[in-house]
From Swiss-Prot:
InterPro entries: Aminoacid_DH-like_N_sf, NAD(P)-bd_dom_sf, SDH_C, Shikimate_DH, Shikimate_DH-bd_N, Shikimate_DH_fam, Shikm_DH/Glu-tRNA_Rdtase. It catalyses: shikimate + NADP(+) = 3-dehydroshikimate + NADPH + H(+). Keywords: Amino-acid biosynthesis, Aromatic amino acid biosynthesis, NADP, Oxidoreductase. This is Shikimate dehydrogenase (NADP(+)). Involved in the biosynthesis of the chorismate, which leads to the biosynthesis of aromatic amino acids. Catalyzes the reversible NADPH linked reduction of 3-dehydroshikimate (DHSA) to yield shikimate (SA). One of its GO terms (biological process) is chorismate biosynthetic process. PANTHER family: BIFUNCTIONAL 3-DEHYDROQUINATE DEHYDRATASE_SHIKIMATE DEHYDROGENASE, CHLOROPLASTIC (PTHR21089:SF1), SHIKIMATE DEHYDROGENASE (PTHR21089). The active site is at 75 (proton acceptor). It comes from Cupriavidus necator (strain ATCC 17699 / DSM 428 / KCTC 22496 / NCIMB 10442 / H16 / Stanier 337) (Ralstonia eutropha). Shikimate binds at residues 24-26, 71, 96, 111, 235. The gene is aroE. Pfam families: SDH_C, Shikimate_DH, Shikimate_dh_N. Pathway: Metabolic intermediate biosynthesis; chorismate biosynthesis; chorismate from D-erythrose 4-phosphate and phosphoenolpyruvate: step 4/7. Belongs to the shikimate dehydrogenase family. GO terms for molecular function: NADP binding; shikimate 3-dehydrogenase (NADP+) activity.
Amino acid sequence: MTSTDSSQATSDRYVVIGNPVAHSRSPAIHAAFARQTGEAVQYDRLEAPLDGFADAVRQFFAEGGYGCNVTVPFKLEAYDLADRLTERAEAAGAVNTLWIEEGLIHGDNTDGIGLVRDIQDNLDTLIEGKRVLLLGAGGAAMGAMLPLIECRPSRIVVANRTASRASDMLEEFVEAADQYGVELWGGGLDALDGLSEDEAVDVVINASSSSLHGEVPPVPEFLLGEGVLAYDMMYGAEPTVFLQFAARCGARTSDGLGMLVEQAAEAFYIWRGVRPRTAPVLAELRAALQAERKG
């Protein structure tokens, strides 16, 4: 047995499970966390059949696996599979982190906390007291809502292509918003044209699928002016078309690479009880993306 084989044999096994999953940067992120913290972690990719997610997870745990990160298209199935859910997983209606505890499968959703930590810690933008515009009302937006509310912004506006879906999503968070003193408003994307400049926002978060399709959400330019942070949950070697548009309008921009690293750090903390430093890992990933762009 080689030294590498020996270290893997004595390391606790974790995976990111999805379909497809070959593109995932999670193994590189968690390998960096393990080196930094000295934790004995082996982290791999696991592609599950589209009709075999639950069986793949159960088999992984039966073979001694410690935890899973869950990516598309299995986050809703992970929610159903978990025996125990955290409050934020219940609020999100989806799970991206699984682990075994006392024989039960536990599920959490670290996407939203990853988002707010990236915005507040890495981008130095305090959310408390700010006005936030959230574009989209799908799973990504659902996962962001409770962590955003817990930051106590003054107002969260949700705008979605289908207005009723935005309103329905906000209904799920009325109680939490009341608890934290947050005003909620939701409607269709076309309703943004009716906002006055007095109703300008401080942070615009694109949680819609528009960037996947190379589309720019119909956001009035005055909402993306100087002093506004425009954030896209997507990331890539090139800025998304939304971020390019926002930059032309004068906004400060950021993609979702930091969110990816921060949600991974939260999962690592859940599993290992050690919170890794994210800044050096984010810098490594950013450099890798820039190298891909030049290549």
